[in-house]
Regions:
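Extended, charge-rich alpha-helical interface modules
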Residues: 1-68
């Protein structure tokens, strides 16, 4: 993933997959659900990191670097 938008879309896809899995009766499959939850948490961290970086980059472009 290169952008926060891509990471957000992947996070939404994983969250939808989790809902679909529960509706399909896979909620009791601990191994699958743990793996999916781990993927969601990892992707959430990637999304936040990319979003913060993009915001900081835009802020620097608009107002110059922060000093002090």
């Amino acid at each position: 993933m290169n952008t926060a938008l891509e990471a957000r879309n992947e996070l939404r896809r994983l969250q939808a997959e989790r809902l679909d899995a529960v509706e399909a009766g896979l909620g009791e499959n601990a191994l699958y659900m743990t793996d999916l939850d781990n993927d969601i948490e990892a992707n959430r961290a990637i999304y936040v990191g990319l979003a913060v970086t993009e915001i900081a980059t835009l802020r620097a472009q608009l107002g110059g670097p922060q000093l002090g």
